Every structure is written in C-alpha cells, then in structure tokens.
C-alpha cells in the first residue's frame, strides 16, 4: 500500500512540473522579448509572476525576465526588452 502512495505522489509531481514545459519553446524561432504573451495564460498572482519570469528567461536571450502586465481583461505575461 505504501508503494502505491509513493507512486501516486511521484506521478503528481511529474505532472505538476511538466505543465510549464510546453511554454518554454519559442515558436517559429521568434523571440519572446518585448512582447505580451496571451498564450501563457493568466498572470495575476505571485506564483504566476514567477512562472512568467522563468518562461521569459528561457525564451528570451536578454536575460531580463518579465512582469505580469495589468490589462483590462486580466494580467498578461510580458517579457522585458
């Protein structure tokens, strides 16, 4: 029974950490720099801000990161120029 709990916990961890992986690829060789990214999804909480920062660092060569840009329809991930 304990091995089932360990397996279930490991599976949940893998699924949780793989959620952000699809966003790390830069589409069509373009840069994430200086752009809003609605495809990233919501960007309203501190956790979203940290995910956006990691996403921009991995997809933008300037190493400057990001911020969650407040918009009328909700926050968007915006990578610095």
Curated annotation (Swiss-Prot):
Stretch forming the signal peptide: 1-23
SS bonds (residue pairs): 33-81, 43-68, 52-77, 56-79
GO biological process, one term: defense response to fungus
Transmembrane segments: none
Keywords: Antimicrobial, Disulfide bond, Fungicide, Plant defense, Secreted, Signal
GO cellular component: extracellular region
Superkingdom: Eukaryota
Subcellular location: Secreted
Entries under Pfam families matching the protein: Defensin_like
Primary localization class, coarse: secreted
Similarity annotation: Belongs to the DEFL family.
Stated name of the protein: Putative defensin-like protein 25
Source organism of this protein record: Arabidopsis thaliana (Mouse-ear cress)
